[in-house]
Each structure stands twice: as C-alpha cells, then as structure tokens.
From Swiss-Prot:
GO terms for biological process: division septum assembly; sporulation resulting in formation of a cellular spore. InterPro entries: SpoVG (IPR007170), SpoVG_sf (IPR036751). PANTHER family: SEPTATION PROTEIN SPOVG-RELATED. Keywords: Cell cycle, Cell division, Septation. This is Putative septation protein SpoVG.
Amino acid sequence: MEITEVRVQRVSPGNSLKAYANITFDDCFVLHNVRVIEGNDGLYIGMPSRKLSNGEFKNIAHPITAEFREKMTKAVLEVYEKTPIMPGQEAEI
C-alpha cells in the first residue's frame, strides 16, 4: 500500500495539537483527521478516534505494523514541516 497524497492543515498555536492531516492510499482510500501532536519526545501522529460512552477514546483506524506506522508518520511530518504557519492554510504532496 502506497501513500499517494498527504494534506496537512495547521491549527491555532498554543496547545499540543499542531495540525490535522488527511492521508490518501493508492489513490483510492483516504484517512481523515489524523492529528499531529507535540509530546515530550517531539512530534507524533494520532489516529482518528471516537469517544466511547465510558469516556475512553477508541481508534477508528490504525496501522497494524510498526513499519507502516513509521511510514505514515514520516510522510505526514514531512508535509507538516512544509505547511505555512498560518492556521487554515493547507499543504500537500
């Protein structure tokens, strides 16, 4: 499975959530609302999730292998670094 497009939109600065990304695979499937988050060890991506009735969050979709997660993270963060600082503007590859 190849990542064929990544779009990143920054959000307002001031908290750990830095941006949202949409990732397209093989020009036929898109994953929306992947989050770019700044943690204690740097930037990472968070998968789209929903809140359960007990208050916990559950991922809607996620990579199965560490290798594919790394591939997704690298692709998203490369585009994030190229994205204009102004929230609302979008960058893509």
